[in-house]
């Protein structure tokens, strides 16, 4: 196995890493509410503090960083292992949102916090297509007695248009596009299932009818055992790599 080297630690629940051309990595710290840059020598600097729960991140067509902000999570530290994990929505939670952050100035601009009459509950992961539009998941929020049903959205980066593409889903998390951008992949956290949806146009997909599919998507993988799926990325050859919780690894699936 390839050895690993720790570049930076003491990050407060980091997610959404973006490899930059200068060798740095931009990521979010959910528990800290920041967008942070990690230099190759381990130095860190805060780019912006949008607050709430900055989650997935991606560089847009204009060079700005676009953030899925889940609105905030409540965290709990395990008294035995010392690890920190989210245990529900934050006490001061109001709504989820999509934000644009200028990397040069740190200015935070809110683009979307609802789609029609439906508010964004907990946006999680985001990817841009070659036309410069974004696809993102809304995992939703979990409370003591209930949880939201999630969705996938498509939106323009200037804040002018947003569409609900797929709903309902069970905790949709990672999202990615096939190399030819004919397919959008969505990973559900709690079910540990990876689905594929055929893209038919800007913000539209074809849906497989019930009972062949309960989500409308084609099931790509559903490995056995107790695990959960997180963010994903698609390799140049089309393989889908899904961060996998509990087993602590990467699940690689053929399309």
Label the predicted regions.
Residues 1-255:
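Sequence-structural signature of mature extracellular/luminal beta-sheet repeat domains
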């Amino acid at each position: 196995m390839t050895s690993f080297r720790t570049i930076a630690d003491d990050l407060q629940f980091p997610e959404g890493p973006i490899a930059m051309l200068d060798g740095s990595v931009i990521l979010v710290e959910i528990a800290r509410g920041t967008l942070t840059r990690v230099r190759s020598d381990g130095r860190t600097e805060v780019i912006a503090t949008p607050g709430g729960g900055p989650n997935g991140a991606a560089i847009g067509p204009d060079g700005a960083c676009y953030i899925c902000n889940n609105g905030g999570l409540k965290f709990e530290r395990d008294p035995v292992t010392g690890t920190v994990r989210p245990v529900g929505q934050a006490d001061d939670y109001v709504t989820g949102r999509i934000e644009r952050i200028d990397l040069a100035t740190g200015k935070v601009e809110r683009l979307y916090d609802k789609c029609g009459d439906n508010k964004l509950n907990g946006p999680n992961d985001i990817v841009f297509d070659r036309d410069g539009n974004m696809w993102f998941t809304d995992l939703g929020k979990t409370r003591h007695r209930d949880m939201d049903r999630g969705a996938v959205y498509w939106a323009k980066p200037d804040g002018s248009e947003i569409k609900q593409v797929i709903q309902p889903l069970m905790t949709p998390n990672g999202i990615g596009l096939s190399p030819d951008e004919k397919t959008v992949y969505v990973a559900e956290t709690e079910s540990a299932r990876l689905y594929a949806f055929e893209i038919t146009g800007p913000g539209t997909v074809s849906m497989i009818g019930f009972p062949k599919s309960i989500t409308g998507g084609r099931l790509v993988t559903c490995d056995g055992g107790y695990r959960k799926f997180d963010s994903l990325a698609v390799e140049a050859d089309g393989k889908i790599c899904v961060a996998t919780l509990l087993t602590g690894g990467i699940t690689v699936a053929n399309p």
